[in-house]
């Protein structure tokens, strides 16, 4: 019984224990109860081979290699010697292939020691219970996985503040080229968000929402190592890992910055291709906007020369600025600064002409007064003709009275009357009408 306890608590595996004994010890002193049947058969085979060669069998040749058990020497964590990842933690391509892996929903579902990669992500048993972060921490699952029907059996011994994992998360694809890293890191960030680790992802300002734990850092390092092999990483990622091979957070932060830069580049190109200017805004503001866009594109590796920039600017000119297309298109060596000198000249000329014009604006009341004065000029014509008619009517009455009383008046009066009747009557009007006596 004492030998059984020693064999159970020994840090060395049974295979190595059997390999360390000689053939003589196997036949004479070995207790068959100390090891299993399979180990006994291995020891007997090793002893038979040792007897035939008359030499002691080394441990490395006696025990067959077991790929699912790591020796104590390889289970330790060391700094990387060559490459961004430690050689002890690297996996073969068959082990890293996610096609045969089970989908998982939380870092604690993967049983491994810190900073050491397990041979495989073995699926947990049906009775296994794994803790999960509460809903207030991290990012919830955004979309259900196609394999969401597979669930774990609940256990009554779970803590009150922990819930069992009910959904699996699809792992990201394998990185196969350095050029695919920008697209791959997007899927990897989505994978972390679906794994309730959205809070540790750096935001726009480069800082995460919450502090990452040691277990989460281990999960981050291991998954990044498996899905992004070192030979397919870009140069800038290898430079970061060469300083600290566990600094995955810095890689994510730099990747997010590059994503934002790519988005800004696309927006700048669209803005530069759709420029419009007609003098409605100050020329200084328009020049600042265009030069800032060109400088950003040049700094990000998208070089815009003077010829292309001038063509894009002139294509968006309208109004009085449109003629610059025809006066400057023959100048092959024209720069953006020279083009903006012409734009400034036209803008200043427009502002000067606007300032020279009177700013007086006629009020509606003035227009009403003008209309009233116009009507008053026509009315005197009507009013001037009416008194004439009344005066003529009075003169007619007076003359008729004189005619009726002509018999009693002297002859001189008759002569004057007859003389006055033969003379034309002058009307004080504009038309200078001459009325004969027959019209009365």
Curated annotation (Swiss-Prot):
The modification Phosphoserine is found at residue 416. It is found in: Cytoplasm. Retrotransposons are mobile genetic entities that are able to replicate via an RNA intermediate and a reverse transcription step. In contrast to retroviruses, retrotransposons are non-infectious, lack an envelope and remain intracellular. Ty1 retrotransposons belong to the copia elements (pseudoviridae). The keyword Phosphoprotein applies. It comes from Saccharomyces cerevisiae (strain ATCC 204508 / S288c) (Baker's yeast). Residues 153-165, 402-418 have a biased composition (Low complexity). It comes from the Eukaryota. Residues 299-401 are annotated as: RNA-binding. Residues 1-23, 48-60, 71-93, 127-152, 419-428 have a biased composition (Polar residues). One of its GO terms (cellular component) is cytoplasm. The gene is TY1A-PR1. The record marks 401-402 as: Cleavage. GO terms for molecular function: RNA binding. Pfam families: TYA (PF01021). Residues 1-93, 126-173, 352-440 are annotated as: Disordered. The lineage of its organism: Eukaryota, Fungi, Dikarya, Ascomycota, Saccharomycotina. Keywords: Cytoplasm, Phosphoprotein, RNA-binding, Transposable element. This is Transposon Ty1-PR1 Gag polyprotein. Homotrimer. InterPro entries: TYA. The keyword Zinc does not apply.
């Amino acid at each position: 019984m004492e030998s059984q306890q020693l064999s159970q608590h020994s840090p060395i595996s049974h295979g190595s224990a059997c390999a360390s004994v000689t053939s003589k010890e196997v036949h004479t002193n070995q207790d068959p109860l100390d090891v299993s049947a399979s180990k006994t058969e291995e020891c007997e085979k090793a002893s038979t081979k040792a007897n035939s060669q008359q030499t002691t069998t080394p441990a490395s040749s006696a025990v067959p290699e077991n790929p699912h058990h790591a020796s104590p020497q390889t289970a330790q964590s060391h700094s990387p010697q060559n490459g961004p990842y430690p050689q002890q933690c690297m996996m073969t391509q068959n082990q890293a292939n996610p096609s045969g892996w089970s989908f998982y929903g939380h870092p604690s579902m993967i049983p491994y020691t810190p900073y050491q990669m397990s041979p495989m992500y073995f699926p947990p048993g049906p009775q296994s219970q794994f803790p999960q972060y509460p809903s207030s921490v991290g990012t919830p699952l955004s979309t259900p996985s196609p394999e969401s029907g597979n669930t774990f059996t609940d256990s009554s011994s779970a803590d009150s503040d922990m819930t069992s994992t009910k959904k699996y998360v699809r792992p990201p694809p394998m990185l196969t080229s350095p050029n695919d890293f920008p697209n791959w890191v997007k899927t990897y960030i989505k994978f972390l968000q679906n794994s309730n680790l959205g809070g540790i992802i750096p935001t726009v300002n480069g800082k995460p929402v919450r502090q990452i734990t040691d277990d989460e850092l281990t999960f981050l390092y291991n998954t990044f190592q498996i899905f992004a092999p070192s030979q397919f990483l870009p140069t800038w990622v290898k430079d970061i890992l060469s300083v600290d091979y566990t600094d995955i957070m810095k890689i994510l932060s730099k990747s997010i910055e590059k994503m934002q830069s790519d988005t800004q580049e696309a927006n700048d190109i669209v803005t530069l291709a759709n420029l419009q200017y007609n003098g409605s805004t100050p020329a200084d503001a328009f020049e600042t906007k265009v030069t800032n866009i060109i400088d950003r594109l040049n700094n990000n590796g998208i070089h815009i020369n003077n010829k292309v920039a001038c063509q894009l600017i002139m294509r968006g000119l309208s109004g009085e600025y449109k003629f610059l297309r025809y006066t400057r298109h023959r100048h092959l060596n024209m720069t953006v600064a020279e083009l903006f000198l012409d734009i400034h000249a036209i803008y200043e000329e427009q502002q000067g002409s606007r300032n020279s014009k009177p700013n007086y604006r006629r009020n509606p009341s003035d227009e009403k007064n003008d209309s009233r004065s116009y009507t008053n000029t026509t009315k005197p014509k009507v009013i001037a003709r009416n008194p004439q008619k009344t005066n003529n009517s009075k003169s007619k009455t007076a003359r008729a009275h004189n005619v009726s009383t002509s018999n009693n008046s002297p002859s001189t009066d008759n002569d004057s009357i007859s003389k006055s009747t033969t003379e034309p009557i002058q009307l004080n009007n504009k038309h200078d009408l001459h009325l004969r006596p027959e019209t009365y």
